[in-house]
């Protein structure tokens, strides 16, 4: 709103502030409430389910309004942040008692989904990331910031495909893009995408701002000096963070250069299908992390999630982690460390809040307890001889001076906020103790003073009192007023009484009337000074937090290795993937019966397995467990297998299951083909590829042709491939492609019911058991019976598919029979004969039916 002259002074002040933040909800402090006006009020009332009302008039119109009590702010903020909204907090900074006109107000905080730091607004086991993006169709600079930990990274990525896969991995809650980019770009479709002015991405300004933030002359030390696009994106992020926090950011100390080549790349479909930390329903149950995460601290859980979503190809790092896990397993050393690690808590985020100067008293109490636990933990770590663990121990250190300071300063169980005081211990500051004593002991002082004055003057009717208008006084009956001592100064005359004050009482009054407010101000000043002291030690404290989080993850992986029967994989130079008695780590935990372990062997002689077998026979489980074993190996973990030998892989692809993409206007088959195309374009001879039921979303012959061609292409690429299919024609591929082999999941039928044995055996399956699975699923008996009739008719009249000429050799494998859906219909007599229920017929009925059948011939 530009013309403010018609508004009241209060609303003029409001609009001057609101015009600076047009796209964010403004919470405007008025006394004990945050008021919300105009369109913000209508939106907030709906989102928060609070009453919308009106507040008088301004500019001739009533003002839509809603409000919340100031002490309930955090709960409402949490709800709005979860809904993706941003909120501007506008506080009163002037004194209402001395202000002429509206009390002075200013914006003190801007809360956005990506820049929140309050514990109540965060998921403790998930990173809360904000990203910025700059580039063109060919090359992109991506910067990512977690303001709750100080982790700040940059990278440059080629092409939309790789960029979208990386955004899927990071899942930032906010994504900043230049306002001059074309509309409807793929990145803008992500939730939380926000446009920023192009000058926020200026590369020269960004470089200067980053060097100033890190107190360096250039960015060469971070290995990203030449990443101009990423630097522009990082500069935008830094500006945005400072704009929202309204304070310096001392906990942002460095910039990490990430490279896709250092990682095993998983696209979005693969992450979803493997259910690493989010299941297909969007929850966390029955995910890989739910099984392998028994970390003692939330910061370690977040680190483990980062490892799972960013497996490494750096053999030195992986072997260092393996050695650390072995060391922690030796003599069950992890059991001694884990209870001590639990005492550390989430100091990573506590330190970030200290850096942002919004740490709460309970944050400092938790930091005090963590620092107090470090010496005992440090002693336990001296026994760990693994080189990587020794480095972590050296980084961790101890902080006796800070621990002592916090022990002297913070009471055992402090209140949630500093606002009302009661945080600092007695004895920490003499002036504060005196002010608190005056405030808390005023009543006793007056009682003692009255007793002393009665004794001094001999006036038994003397009283000491207080009222808000005249303050403290000594009261005497009018008849005794003339006997008042010389140091009594007349203050007030009443009917029948005179009130006096003495120099001693006046001095006490001056202290007492302001003692409480002065005590609160003094305590806040001391608390802020305490934060500044901690900020001066922030760098080593953050390094210690990172080391402790990694120690926690490694201890957790050792505990999981012991209790889940995991074994150390061995990386080799020879291209291979050999697994003995491999298991699915998640399925194994939910089964009530023993899990059937299986072997897998892929090397230079066999690069692809064609997997056949019945639905529910275990094909998808076998494929997924292979991918999870490979992924766990690439985070340095032990794996669910008796043994595992593998070479480093560059990518893991999964095309398992599909659903349509209604929002994107794509059918199930289109989604399936898009995922297949991505695999065929990007897979290499170092990639692991899982393909399940390719081609099932279209007609039989189209689907078979596509599946066949895709399998041939993957065989030619020499990718490590598990190709599950119900197209039995594909089982002849080994005859034309020497790197392909057949395996199947076995099953048997007993009393017309299927029994899944889940063993992976060489060769193709003999049949698909489709009707048996349908019966197991509860399809009505009549429908199953009718299906058997149709199946019998089709198998009786169909012609076998002719094999390609290349596969007609006499030693070609026997392909299980597939029905020809286009064969001629059976003779009516045969069809009627197939429907007969012979066990229900009498001899006479059987003879009559025989004559009827003869007449049909």
Swiss-Prot record:
Stretch list, region Disordered: 797-820
Binding site for ATP: 613-620
UniProt-listed InterPro entries: DNA_mismatch_repair_MutS, DNA_mismatch_repair_MutS-lik_N, DNA_mismatch_repair_MutS/MSH, DNA_mismatch_repair_MutS_C, DNA_mismatch_repair_MutS_clamp, DNA_mismatch_repair_MutS_core, DNA_mismatch_repair_MutS_N, DNA_mismatch_repair_MutS_sf
Keyword Ribonucleoprotein: no
GO molecular function: ATP binding; ATP-dependent DNA damage sensor activity; damaged DNA binding; mismatched DNA binding
Organism domain of life: Bacteria
GO CC terms in record: cytosol
GO-annotated biological processes: mismatch repair
Keywords: ATP-binding, DNA damage, DNA repair, DNA-binding, Nucleotide-binding
Annotated family: Belongs to the DNA mismatch repair MutS family.
Function: This protein is involved in the repair of mismatches in DNA. It is possible that it carries out the mismatch recognition step. This protein has a weak ATPase activity.
Name assigned to this protein: DNA mismatch repair protein MutS
């Amino acid at each position: 709103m530009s013309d403010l002259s018609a508004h009241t002074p209060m609303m003029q002040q409001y609009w001057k502030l609101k015009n600076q933040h047009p796209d964010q909800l403004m919470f405007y402090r008025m006394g004990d409430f945050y008021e919300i006006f105009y369109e913000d009020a209508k939106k907030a009332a709906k989102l928060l389910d609070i009453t919308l009302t009106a507040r008088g008039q301004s500019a001739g119109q009533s003002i839509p309004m809603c409000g919340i009590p100031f002490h309930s702010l955090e709960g409402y903020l949490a709800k709005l942040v979860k809904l993706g909204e941003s909120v501007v907090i506008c506080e009163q900074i002037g004194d209402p008692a001395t202000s002429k006109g509206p009390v002075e107000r200013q914006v003190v905080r801007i809360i956005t989904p990506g820049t929140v730091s309050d514990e109540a607004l965060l998921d403790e086991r998930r990173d809360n990331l904000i990203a910025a993006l700059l580039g063109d169709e060919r090359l992109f600079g991506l910067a990512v910031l977690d303001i709750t930990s100080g982790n700040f990274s940059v990278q440059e990525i080629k092409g939309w495909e790789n960029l979208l896969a990386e955004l899927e991995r990071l899942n930032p809650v906010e994504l900043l893009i230049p306002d001059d980019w074309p509309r409807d770009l793929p990145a803008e479709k992500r939730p939380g995408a926000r446009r920023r002015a192009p000058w926020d991405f200026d590369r020269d300004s960004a470089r200067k701002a980053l060097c100033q933030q890190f107190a360096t002359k250039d960015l060469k030390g971070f290995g990203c000096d030449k990443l101009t696009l990423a630097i522009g994106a990082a500069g935008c992020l830094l500006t945005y963070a400072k704009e929202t926090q309204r304070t310096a950011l001392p906990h942002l100390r460095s910039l990490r250069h990430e490279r896709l080549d250092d990682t095993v790349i998983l696209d979005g479909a693969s992450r979803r299908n493997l259910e690493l930390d989010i299941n297909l329903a969007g929850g966390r149950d029955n995910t890989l992390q739910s099984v392998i995460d028994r970390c003692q601290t939330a910061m370690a859980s977040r680190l483990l999630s980062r490892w799972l979503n960013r497996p490494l190809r750096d053999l030195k790092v992986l072997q260092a982690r393996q050695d650390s896990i072995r060391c922690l397993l030796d003599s069950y050393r992890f059991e001694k460390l884990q209870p001590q690690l639990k005492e550390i808590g989430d100091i990573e985020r506590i330190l970030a809040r200290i850096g942002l100067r919004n740490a709460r008293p309970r944050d400092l109490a938790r930091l005090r307890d963590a620092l107090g636990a470090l010496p005992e933990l440090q002693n336990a770590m001296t026994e760990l001889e693994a080189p990587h663990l020794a480095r972590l121990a050296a980084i961790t250190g101890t902080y006796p001076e800070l621990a002592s300071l916090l022990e002297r300063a913070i009471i055992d169980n402090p209140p949630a906020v500093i606002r009302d005081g009661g945080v600092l211990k007695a004895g920490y500051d003499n002036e504060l103790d005196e002010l608190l004593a005056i405030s808390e002991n005023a009543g006793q002082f007056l009682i003692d003073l009255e007793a002393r004055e009665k004794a001094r003057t001999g006036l038994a009717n003397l009283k000491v009192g207080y009222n808000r208008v005249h303050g403290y006084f000594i009261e005497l009956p009018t008849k005794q007023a003339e006997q008042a001592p010389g140091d009594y100064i007349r203050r007030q005359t009443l009917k029948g009484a005179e009130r006096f004050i003495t120099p001693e009482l006046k001095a006490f009054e001056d202290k007492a009337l302001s003692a409480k407010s002065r005590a609160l101000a003094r305590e806040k000043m001391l608390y802020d000074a305490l934060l500044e002291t901690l900020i001066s030690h922030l760098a080593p404290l953050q390094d210690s937090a990172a080391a402790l989080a990694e120690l926690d993850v490694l201890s957790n992986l050792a505990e999981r290795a012991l209790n889940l029967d995991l074994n150390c994989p061995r990386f080799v130079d020879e291209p291979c993937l050999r697994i003995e008695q491999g298991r699915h780590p998640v399925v194994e935990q939910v089964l009530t019966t023993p899990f059937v372990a299986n072997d897998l062997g892929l090397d230079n002689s066999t690069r692809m397995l064609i997997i056949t077998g019945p639905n529910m026979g275990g094909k998808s489980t076998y494929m997924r467990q292979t991918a999870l074993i490979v992924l766990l190996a690439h985070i340095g973990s032990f794996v669910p297998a008796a043994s595992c030998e593998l070479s480093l892989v560059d990518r893991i692809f999964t095309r398992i299951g599909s659903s349509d993409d209604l929002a994107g206007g794509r059918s199930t088959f289109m989604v399936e083909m898009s995922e297949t195309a991505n695999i065929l374009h990007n897979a290499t001879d170092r990639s692991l590829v899982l393909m399940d039921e390719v081609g099932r979303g279209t007609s039989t012959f189209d689907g078979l042709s596509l599946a066949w061609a895709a399998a041939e292409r993957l065989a030619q690429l020499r990718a490590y491939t598990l190709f599950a299919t119900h197209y039995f024609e594909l089982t002849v591929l080994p005859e034309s492609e020497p790197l392909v082999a057949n395996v199947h999941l076995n099953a048997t039928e007993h009393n017309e019911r299927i029994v899944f044995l889940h063993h992976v055996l060489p060769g193709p399956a003999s049949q698909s058991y489709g009707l048996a699975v349908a019966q197991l699923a509860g399809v009505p008996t009549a429908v199953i019976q009718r299906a058997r009739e149709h199946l019998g008719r089709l198998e009786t009249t169909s012609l076998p598919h002719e094999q390609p000429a290349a596969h007609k050799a006499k030693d070609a494998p026997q392909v299980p029979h597939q029905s020809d859906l286009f064969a001629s219909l059976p003779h009516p007599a045969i069809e009627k004969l197939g429907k007969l229920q012979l066990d229900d017929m009498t001899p006479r009925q059987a003879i009559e039916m025989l004559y009827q059948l003869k007449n049909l011939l």
